[in-house]
Amino acid sequence: MYPEELCKPMREELTSSGFQELTTVEQVNKLFTNKDKTFLIFINSVCGCAAGSARPGVILSTQNAKRPDLFTTVFAGQDKEATQKAREYMTPYPPSSPSIALFKNGEIVHFIERHEIEGNLKHVIADNLIKAYNQHC
């Protein structure tokens, strides 16, 4: 587990852009009671591809006219139980961080794995998400 003072700016980068942080299993489970909404879960990470591509890309995607009703995040390696619970809802995709999941009516409809983030620019990540928003939101 990384020191919170290291992770705090990585959390705030998302929360200052309107993301709701999910730090408990209860918060994750409550999110899935929103059966009539679309929502995104970003699995945050301290790795370089989270900082260079994933966080900037997912934040950029929030500017699209069509977008999920809720933007949420869990922090892998920090909020372990919440992250594990979120990953259970992301089956059949293997655990990966960072990763991004879009849900509609409680069902996963789009997923971006770490290997799709690594080496890509933030605009590529944002465009990938925007296409999914335009289709599902």
Task: Describe the function of each predicted region.
Residues I43, K66-K85:
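Thiol-based oxidoreductase modules, predominantly thioredoxin-like and allied folds used
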Residues M1-D36, Y133, C137:
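N-terminal leader/targeting and pre-domain segments
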Residues T83-S97:
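Short acidic (Asp/Glu) patches
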Residues P94-C137:
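Non-catalytic, surface beta->alpha helical segment in thiol-disulfide oxidoreductase systems
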Residues A51-N64:
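Typically the conserved alpha-helix immediately C-terminal to a functionally engaged Cys/Sec
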Residues N29, C47-G48:
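Short, catalytically relevant binding-site loops at active-site mouths
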